[in-house]
Amino acid sequence: MALSVANVGLDCEDVWRVANFWSAALGQSVDEGSSEAFASIGGANVQRTQPAWFFHKVPEPATTKNRVHVDLIDPGENRVARLVDLGARVIEEHDIGVHSWTVMEDPEGHVFCVAAKVYTG
């Protein structure tokens, strides 16, 4: 049987800061019962069609770039500006002709990419 993605987990120094950023970015509420030690988005929805997001408190700051990142799609014209307004930072932009995307960091430095459409190769 093949694996499927259940959750996206992020280690955080400030759980609320990161969870609130992703809540606004994804347009979903932080789950009831979330705390300073652990928060989630979509975790309470047992019939979800997308992975839930989990935010785990850790005592130490990240010291290296994360080796896995999330690629997100937003067809809206202002996708990058909206995320910057929420607290993200642009790292670099890429355009290979048939596909373009922006590499960004959330307020605590978790790297992610955003594009207007899914890259199909």
Regions found by a protein language model. Give the residues of each.
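A short acidic/small-residue loop/turn micro-motif
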Residues: 98, 118-121
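Charge-dense, helix-prone N-terminal extensions
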Residues: 24-29, 48, 62, 78, ...
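Short acidic/glycine-enriched loop/turn segments that link adjacent beta-strands
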Residues: 35-38, 64, 96-100
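Core segments of cupin and vicinal oxygen chelate
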Residues: 2, 9-52, 85
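Domain-length accessory/inserted modules outside core catalytic folds
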Residues: 40-48, 52-65, 72-74
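Vicinal oxygen chelate
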Residues: 15, 70-108
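Active-site beta-strand termini and strand-to-loop segments that position acidic
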Residues: 41-46, 104-107, 117
